[in-house]
């Protein structure tokens, strides 16, 4: 086992604070509408330019292991805030630094660290309740656009695009961000259900100019099995041909003789058919087939429930107004499934989301809800260079997370004003002893830090602005973009309540752990460990000499 380096008490805390400050100072320059850029060197390719707090935090690794421990713990604050609300990483880092700095001063002055932590926790719990009381619902497009604009560093086009996307696909809809091809940002909306499976044979194409298969009012056969024998399908094909409608086959696979016969029938014009593989794998494929069945009013033909393909009738087939299939995707538009059945299926999947333990499962389930409930919107980010594209894409993703958080828990006045109001309301909060009171004061003082940092990044004097804002009430605050005072909500400076709440809670959680740290242990650097080993060996040799 490698030799360890151990530090205690004040020595440990000083080192830890140094690491916290390095990381926080690098991150906090990005805060606010006039936040600065940070350039990150990459081992290959061009450097990345970003104003995203968590991207900066992730890059920081310090040489001194004790300092690095402090930095990594604050990095955890940024990551947790990002995971919970998708934004507010810089605010969380600024709050953590402020609480840790003031808290460690109090510990150095002889306060009891455990009581300080209890005081901080008490203040934060009360602050969260006050934030909820200040919160106003965010339901209209204008408010959604304003939240998106603020989170995307005052880029109005991004805010408007996100609001438009939410209008088109609903609050539950899936909105994805992709690289665009031009200089302008674009919004693409895919109505209906789309999944990532294309046609099984290019001979199904009936729109050569677009390279797509388009079926108007088709029947849809859903089979949870491989189809290789055409005889299984003859009864269904004959019934569909008599009805004079096209047929879409969605199965685990269609191969060999079955696929060849379908192609020949299509080319001869006997019956218009297209076949695609079912989306997903394993249990997820079964679930997605069931989703499509619910959407189209059909039944999944599955041998597991004793249904055979030869006995399928037109009643077992789903229907839709239109289906478009290209090389990679299939889109089913306006399925004829009953609204009540679709809503029941959506409620069932939402229940599974509540119970899901992994982020991946949760994300996949949310995609399924969106496909059933509304559709998918794609924001295509335009930029002149790849470096700008990466930076802008990160901002759009942040803005998207922020708007979702705003819809979920509402909004409060932005620009750090909500925390200032909360702190002033809690001025009379008291703990069980004097040390806890100091902890409460530490937390309340730290709540001014985001506003002060926003002002500092503008090049103004933080204390002057903070005192002016404290002198006002309600939503009165400082608009750093225009450098004027006024009602933050009227000026469209909004923060999602969830983002502010998460930032405060995670900052206080990690700060409390660091304030109560009394000992730090790390591996000795390799050179020091080698020197120790060499010294031990020399002593042994001296003993040998004595024996001679």
UniProtKB/Swiss-Prot annotation:
Cited InterPro entries: Chaperonin_Cpn60_CS, Cpn60/GroEL, Cpn60/GroEL/TCP-1, GroEL-like_apical_dom_sf, GROEL-like_equatorial_sf, TCP-1-like_intermed_sf
One of the GO biological process terms: response to heat
Chemical reaction(s) catalysed: ATP + H2O + a folded polypeptide = ADP + phosphate + an unfolded polypeptide
GO MF: ATP binding; ATP hydrolysis activity; ATP-dependent protein folding chaperone; identical protein binding; isomerase activity; magnesium ion binding; unfolded protein binding
Binding site for ATP: 30-33, 51, 87-91, 415, 479-481, 495
Domain of life: Bacteria
Keyword NAD: no
N6-acetyllysine sites (modified residues): 117
PTM comment: Phosphorylated reversibly during heat shock. Can be UMPylated on a tyrosine residue by SelO/YdiU, probably under stress conditions.
Keyword Acetylation found: yes
Any one Gene Ontology cellular component term annotated for this protein: cytosol
Coiled coil: none
Subcellular location: Cytoplasm
Regulation of catalytic or functional activity: During the substrate-folding cycle, the two GroEL rings separate for effective substrate binding and chaperonin activity. Ring separation is triggered by ATP binding to the trans ring of the asymmetric GroEL:GroES complex and avoids formation of functionally impaired symmetric GroEL:GroES2 complexes. Activity of the GroEL-GroES chaperonin complex requires Mg-ATP. UMPylation of the chaperone by SelO/YdiU negatively regulates its activity, and may facilitate survival under stress conditions.
Entry keyword set: Acetylation, ATP-binding, Chaperone, Cytoplasm, Isomerase, Nucleotide-binding
EC number: 5.6.1.7
Residues carrying N6-succinyllysine: 34, 51, 117, 277, 321, 390
PROSITE patterns xref list: CHAPERONINS_CPN60 (PS00296)
Domain remark text: Each subunit is composed of an apical domain that binds non-folded proteins and GroES, an intermediate domain and an equatorial domain that binds ATP and is involved in inter-ring interactions. Forms a large central channel that appears to traverse the entire length of the cylinder with no obstruction. The central channel of GroEL functions as two cavities, one in each ring, that are separated from each other by the crystallographically disordered 23-amino-acid C-terminal segments of the seven subunits. The entry and exit of polypeptide seem to be restricted to the apical end of each ring.
Role, per record: Together with its co-chaperonin GroES, plays an essential role in assisting protein folding. The GroEL-GroES system forms a nano-cage that allows encapsulation of the non-native substrate proteins and provides a physical environment optimized to promote and accelerate protein folding, probably by preventing aggregation and by entropically destabilizing folding intermediates. Also plays a role in coupling between replication of the F plasmid and cell division of the cell.
Subunit: Forms a cylinder of 14 subunits composed of two heptameric rings stacked back-to-back. Interacts with the co-chaperonin GroES. Can form asymmetrical complexes, composed of one GroEL and one GroES, and symmetrical complexes, formed between one GroEL and two GroES oligomers. The asymmetrical complex is the functional unit. It was suggested that the symmetric heterooligomer may represent a transient intermediate in the chaperonin protein folding cycle.
Similarity comment text for this entry: Belongs to the chaperonin (HSP60) family.
Protein name: Chaperonin GroEL
Gene from which this protein is expressed: groEL
